[in-house]
């Protein structure tokens, strides 16, 4: 006799910690009206500035989305490593900020704390608003199991022959929207802006007929500048929606995604705006293609082509001339897939040869005046 069991298993998400532990740090905590600020001795000054920034942007973000976290948000300021980033753990209601300003080749210059705290808190608020079952239930599995009819007398069931498992996510927000609205922040925000770096990346995709499709914008894990293109495309599309249909549409879409049976961004946009996500994307695509082609057409009349010095790899950055002027050092990810997998190379112009100096170099090189040392 076949026996079938259907059940729901509530799942918890376990994230591995990739950063090193630092037991030598002496941690402190203080409270503001809406945040718990955590810092170690070396980041006290940054933490106090961060507290001021966080309270200043709190009403702007929460009023924009019409949502407030259920309790004080944890804001952790740390600076133990030669690293910079920000992260929002929206189920934990926690933000981690590395104190050192981020110097990223694909972004322009922005005020670090104001930018990163607003960006990450926008994640906290917008993604918590989109949750289907709150922060305590991140998801579920619908499962069904069947067993062989034959079984041992001392065993309750036969050997399992069927296992069907269907995940039901508690949050269903595509990356382009999550990152797009976090960069948009709120109306008239100027901590993060559409800078020339972002414009260059999107413009290059448009004029070379290489725009990310609506589906391609829904994932990370791309090579080269593909992941950054998800950020840029999401920022541009979110801004387009806000300009064409009102910025309240962004908040309303997040609210629509919180509906228990709403798992489609295409349908969620349709329910809010009255047009499908595919149609909105097509309008957006046509709009920016017309814009960039109009700007580029005059340049095409008398094009000026430079000489390509390096063609291998998707990242070739920070070239520095040798004091002699006959060679240069640069960073490249040749042989690797991702933008940040760079190594230091030395190129001899006369010989036309490259030499790898050191793997895993991420900052711009500098020559000693004698030309014998490089930092």
Report each predicted region and the residues it spans:
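Acidic/His/Gly-enriched intrinsically disordered linker/tail segments
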Residues: 22-23, 92-94, 112-116, 124, ...
């Amino acid at each position: 006799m076949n026996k079938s069991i259907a059940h729901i298993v509530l799942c918890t998400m376990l994230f591995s910690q990739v950063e090193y532990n630092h037991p030598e740090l002496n941690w402190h905590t203080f409270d503001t009206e809406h945040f718990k600020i955590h810092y170690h001795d070396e980041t006290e000054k940054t933490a106090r500035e961060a507290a001021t920034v966080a309270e200043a942007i709190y009403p702007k973000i929460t009023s924009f989305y019409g949502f407030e976290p259920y309790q004080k948000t944890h804001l952790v300021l740390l600076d133990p490593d030669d690293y910079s980033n920000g992260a929002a753990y929206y189920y934990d209601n926690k933000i981690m900020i590395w104190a050192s300003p981020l110097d990223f080749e694909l972004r322009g210059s922005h005020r670090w704390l104001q930018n990163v705290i607003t960006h990450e808190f926008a994640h906290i608020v917008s993604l918590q608003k989109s949750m289907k079952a709150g922060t305590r239930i991140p998801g579920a599995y619908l499962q069904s199991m069947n067993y062989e009819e034959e079984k041992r007398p001392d065993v309750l069931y036969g050997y399992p022959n069927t296992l069907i498992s269907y995940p039901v996510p508690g949050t269903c927000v595509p990356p382009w929207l999550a990152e797009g609205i976090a960069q948009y922040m709120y109306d008239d925000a100027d901590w993060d802006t559409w800078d020339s770096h972002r414009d260059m990346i999107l413009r290059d995709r448009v004029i070379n007929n290489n725009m990310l499709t609506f589906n391609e914008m829904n994932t990370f894990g791309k090579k080269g500048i593909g992941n950054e293109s998800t950020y840029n495309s999401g920022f541009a599309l979110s801004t387009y929606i806000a300009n064409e249909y009102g910025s309240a549409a962004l908040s309303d879409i997040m609210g629509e995604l919180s509906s228990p049976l709403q798992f489609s961004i295409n349908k969620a946009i349709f329910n809010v705006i009255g047009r499908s996500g595919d149609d909105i994307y097509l309008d957006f695509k046509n709009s920016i293609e017309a814009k960039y082609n109009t700007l580029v057409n005059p340049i095409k009349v008398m094009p000026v082509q430079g000489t390509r010095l390096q063609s291998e790899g998707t990242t070739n950055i920070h070239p520095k001339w040798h004091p002699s002027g006959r060679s240069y050092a640069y960073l490249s990810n040749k042989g690797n897939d991702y933008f940040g997998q760079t190594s230091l190379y030395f190129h001899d112009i006369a010989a036309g040869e490259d030499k790898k100096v050191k793997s895993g170099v991420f900052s711009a090189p500098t020559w000693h005046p004698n030309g014998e040392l490089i930092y």
